[in-house]
Amino acid sequence: PAESVYAQGEYVQTLEGAKSPFADVVQTVMPCVVGVSNRANTFNMISGQTELIEQATGSGVVVTTQGHVVTNYHVIEGANDVQVLSQGRYLKTEIVGYDELTDLAVLRVMEDVHLPAVKMGDIAQVRVGDWAIVIGNPLGKQFADTVTVGVVSALNRELEGSSIVKMLQTDAAINSGNSGGGL
């Protein structure tokens, strides 16, 4: 008969009572991460009316207590209307500015609500092998506030034909809808 192939005895440590070092980071940062809804005017052939229809979703990070949100340009590209999703509620926003070359956009929440702002990190302190925590809204509202974890795989990556320079590479799961979210 085959012998047991699972770890046992003194080599096995229990995780009972152990706390994740990621949980504190997530608890602090998650309220600063919002969903971003890109809506465009679309003609409805049945009703004969023009309607705002969601054409893309992504994520963003609140960077000031005045409601400024940083996201990716490709998340808001072509939008006639942009809203952010915070704590289950859509908030009206305006596009403050964007840069197609760096794929960045800044939004401002137009409603009088308090949104906590994230404390930005220093990219110069990031090293290959450091943990990477991604917080975002993969696939939109249904999966809002999703967390994935990986490591920083490389720094200063450049893609041939890309206008974005000095990218950070991670192996953390990033899905459609995470664009613009917290890393």
Task: For every predicted segment, state its role.
Residues 3-183:
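Serine-dependent protease modules
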